[in-house]
Amino acid sequence: MSKFEVTHLNLFYGENHALKDISIDIPARQVTALIGPSGCGKSSLLRTLNRMNDLVEGVKITGTVTFDGDDIYANIDVKHLRMSVGMVFQKPNPFPMSIYENIAFGLKAQGVKDKAVLDAVVENSLRGAALWEEVKTRLHTPAFGLSGGQQQRLCIARAIAMEPEVILMDEPTSALDPIATHKIEELMDELRKKFTIVIVTHSMNQAKRISDKTAFFWMGELVEHGDTEQIFNNPKDHRTQGYVSGHFG
């Protein structure tokens, strides 16, 4: 079952044709990795899935993107879409407030005031991000006091708190050390049981370790996509072969 269906998508930043006739289905409750060299369009596609590209001046989009069958550019309220499709960025971006308030912020913005409800969501979200045991005694201390890896897991917990169906991740471990990266990858293995995950990564090894599906982009084109094992072990296109083998890119 597809969570997203992208059909003949073209995206322009002014005169720059960043995505060229992209068609891809993204399956539910699996991890899909988007790979390719810098500037190939993978982050542009990621940000199209929750309409973050709307915020870029001069952007133009043609084609269709459906989320659970609904055209996200025609039939879905953007606010609702972004609640359903959470995002974790390259660098951890905790809010300048306590660990607790980072998680509760979105719920409070929606009008939730019941402390018991907030407490439960904060704990469950931190547990879901494998962070609870590390922070449960300091929930009301500043989030900036956490390590980089902990901050990134906090950002994942913040996304989980809104009960999304999808989590988009734009190189979520590129600023982290190997130990923190390993924890995030272990976490993603658990998250896939509940959420659809789409991740942009420059690490071929990471894509092989964590993803069910892989899509390879090159100069704005989707060259090839399919099962991760097939993409890495038996690619059909010579450009894919060259990239995953490290010959270029």
UniProtKB/Swiss-Prot annotation:
Coiled coil: none annotated. Keywords: ATP-binding, Cell inner membrane, Cell membrane, Membrane, Nucleotide-binding, Phosphate transport, Translocase, Transport. Residues 4-244 form the ABC transporter domain. It holds the Pfam family ABC_tran. It is a peripheral membrane protein. Its EC number is 7.3.2.1. It is an enzyme of class 7 (translocase). ATP binds at residues 36-43. One of its GO terms (cellular component) is plasma membrane. It is found in: Cell inner membrane. GO terms for biological process: phosphate ion transmembrane transport. It catalyses: phosphate(out) + ATP + H2O = ADP + 2 phosphate(in) + H(+). GO terms for molecular function: ATP binding; ATP hydrolysis activity; ATPase-coupled phosphate ion transmembrane transporter activity. PROSITE patterns: ABC_TRANSPORTER_1, ABC_TRANSPORTER_2, PSTB. Its main location: membrane. Part of the ABC transporter complex PstSACB involved in phosphate import. Responsible for energy coupling to the transport system. Belongs to the ABC transporter superfamily. Phosphate importer (TC 3.A.1.7) family. The complex is composed of two ATP-binding proteins (PstB), two transmembrane proteins (PstC and PstA) and a solute-binding protein (PstS). This is Phosphate import ATP-binding protein PstB 2. It comes from Shewanella oneidensis (strain ATCC 700550 / JCM 31522 / CIP 106686 / LMG 19005 / NCIMB 14063 / MR-1). The lineage of its organism: Bacteria, Pseudomonadati, Pseudomonadota, Gammaproteobacteria, Alteromonadales.
